[in-house]
């Protein structure tokens, strides 16, 4: 699948990554209750996707980022993996045009990839397998619940 980041020309996109420039009015109008989560991800998508539904978002490959802090979180940890799953669920549940079926297919693939990494590391594979299967079951149940997506995040990520 094509990523706008690979474009050599100015192009429209549905969302922009975190290293983006925004009109001050968009940034000032952004409302999201602070969530005291230990790990947060997808803020760029959660912020920019709704704007992209109403306004034209452009990617300009001529604009270059000079410096970006390195991510310090252990992306292989269970906490980070669970956070990514719940934030993806939040995004899908807050954007009804998103497909739950595609979300599940993605979740299955990500879960299998996590298990493959765990198996290759040969450390705690069975406890990891139990963890991700339990997490997947929770994600499925929450997907069909009428629970408020923000409340799901608050309960699962604090």
PLM regions: where:
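A recurrent flexible, glycine/aromatic-enriched loop bordering the glycosyltransferase active site
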Residues: 3-22, 40, 74
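Acidic donor-binding loop at a coil-to-helix junction in glycosyltransferase catalytic cores
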Residues: 17, 37-49
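Structured helix-beta-strand junction loops
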Residues: 30, 53-54
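Non-catalytic, C-terminal membrane-associated alpha-helical segments of glycosyltransferases
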Residues: 78-87, 97-158
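Short glycine- and hydrophobic/aromatic-rich loop-to-beta-strand nucleating segment
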Residues: 13-27, 45, 57, 65
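Short helix-loop capping/hinge motifs at secondary-structure junctions, enriched
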Residues: 28-29, 98
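Active-site donor/metal-binding and catalytic loop motifs
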Residues: 35-36, 56-78, 87-91
């Amino acid at each position: 699948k094509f990523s706008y980041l690979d474009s050599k020309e100015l192009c429209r996109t549905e969302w922009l990554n975190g290293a983006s420039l925004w009109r001050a009015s968009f940034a000032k109008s952004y409302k999201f209750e602070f969530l005291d989560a230990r790990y947060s991800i997808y803020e760029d998508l959660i912020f920019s996707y709704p704007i992209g539904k109403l306004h034209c978002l452009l990617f300009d490959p001529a604009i270059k980022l000079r410096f970006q802090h390195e991510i310090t979180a252990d992306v292989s940890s269970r906490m980070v993996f669970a956070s990514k799953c719940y934030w993806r669920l939040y995004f899908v549940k807050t954007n009804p045009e998103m497909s739950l079926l595609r979300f599940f297919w993605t979740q299955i693939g990500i879960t299998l990839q996590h298990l493959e990494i765990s198996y290759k590391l040969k450390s705690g594979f069975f406890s990891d397998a139990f963890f991700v299967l339990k997490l997947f079951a929770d994600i499925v149940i929450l997907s069909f619940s009428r629970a408020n997506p923000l409340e799901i995040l608050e309960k699962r990520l604090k």
